[in-house]
Amino acid sequence: MSDFIASKEDDYSKWYLDIVQKAKLADYSPVKGCMVIMPYGYSIWSKIQSILDKKFKETGHENAYFPMLIPYGFLEKEKDHIDGFSPEFAIIKDAGGESLVEPLVLRPTSETIIWNMYSKWIKSYRDLPLKINQWANVIRWEKRTRPFLRTTEFLWQEGHTAHATEEEALEETLLILDVYKRFMEDYLAIPVFCGKKSENEKFAGAVSTYSVEALMQDKKALQAATSHYLGLNFAKAFDVKFQDKDGKMKHVFASSWGVSTRLIGALIMVHSDEKGLILPPRIAPVEIIVIPIFKKEDEINKKILDYSDCVVHTLKKAEFRVEIDKDVRSSPGFRFSSAEFKGIPIRIEVGINDILLNSVTIIRRDKDRKFKYQISLDSLVSKVRVELDSMQKDLFKKALNFRTLNTKEIFRSGKDSYELFKAYVNDYSGFVLSCWCGGLNCENIIKNETKATIRCIPDDFKARDLTGMTCIYCSSKAKYYVLFAKSY
């Protein structure tokens, strides 16, 4: 079955697309750039939703839903915002057989319509902070699309908060950044760098943008999440003011932040192999698949099925997410490969020998088939729990080791330093930690000559001394340590 998946080394793009389709995560729709998220793919998104939704509520956020149709005039109120998004707008000019007085934009993001509503809801300091999250779909007319990574329509969550002070809004922005980081590392087993974006790379309409950056197996970076400090920009555009405790009218400060179904693409590209998808246990919709190994005799098969059902019952009672594959028409090998395609963390095989020994045979998805072993039914629950926990940790360690091996530090030490930097980025990719003067010109030249962008000014290296350090391109005094990478 794995013969149907392209080699990662030979054709990474096809390997990725093969997994999307063979694991039945998504399929192409009749609309260019739009995908159909299939039930298994959606079950992963549902798991992401349930975990993050709980975390948002724990930090004081409530869910709401705002219209998908946004008056064009709303977007014109914030110049930087419309300039940044207008090339991606999908606009409705006719409806009900008539031309609309004002065109409507299909939601590219919701800042404008939400802040229009906030102007009605926020009047006093008692109304603050206002912390709302929305689970929704978004339309951005992308020219080059790829399932989950970049599509015309995608699913996401977007948080929008209003605060009395700049300090509170910034605190919120960084709080959510940390929520995202912990989620990526603790649940998705993806090591990430977090940090501030350059002015050139920030969100349209933001004062500052912070991002979560991960490294894929092809050594390209993926922006997995963003959190924006919006300052007073949208409050002023929509005249959102509150009366403070002293009776003075003031504009409110804002943040917005979001993640999308792009996370499913990240899961594929960080962990998977040429057998198919590999899912970290904490995010897998199904943690365990039980596969009975049938024989030709019906009487023996009934015993195998009864025993398998007992195994499933034991695991479900212990609150594991478990399924059983009872397909008698398919060979065990086919069903093993099917489970591997789907990335189910643990496979339990039940054959006649297992029944005789009161045992089961167990194998982890991230291990070679030769590492399968038998365990007694008495120790099933405890052993499965240990293996799931171990797999979660091992996947993170493996991804972290890969990132460490592919994060290079290149600083200016002579006239050939930039040429070395350029050659490394072009030939090897990965993250490159270097120094930057903060100049837009240097940033653009590096981007044009290497196709690498500043992913972020990473928090991990903030404490490093910049004394004597110079910009990798122009040799002027360095202001920041930055991460460069080619990206999706």
UniProtKB/Swiss-Prot annotation:
One record GO biological process: prolyl-tRNA aminoacylation
Reactions accelerated catalytically: tRNA(Pro) + L-proline + ATP = L-prolyl-tRNA(Pro) + AMP + diphosphate
One Pfam family matching this protein: tRNA-synt_2b
GO cellular component: aminoacyl-tRNA synthetase multienzyme complex; cytoplasm
Range of residues in the leader sequence: none
SMART domains: ProRS-C_1
Main location: cytoplasm
EC identifiers of the protein: 6.1.1.15
Annotated SUPFAM superfamilies: C-terminal domain of ProRS, Class II aaRS ABD-related, Class II aaRS and biotin synthetases
CDD domains from the UniProt entry: ProRS_anticodon_zinc, ProRS_core_arch_euk
Subcellular location: Cytoplasm
Keywords: Aminoacyl-tRNA synthetase, ATP-binding, Cytoplasm, Ligase, Nucleotide-binding, Protein biosynthesis
Family, similarity comment: Belongs to the class-II aminoacyl-tRNA synthetase family. ProS type 3 subfamily.
Domain commentary: Consists of three domains: the N-terminal catalytic domain, the anticodon-binding domain and the C-terminal extension.
Subunit text: Homodimer.
Name of the protein: Proline--tRNA ligase
Species of provenance: Borreliella afzelii (strain PKo) (Borrelia afzelii)
Gene that produces this protein: proS
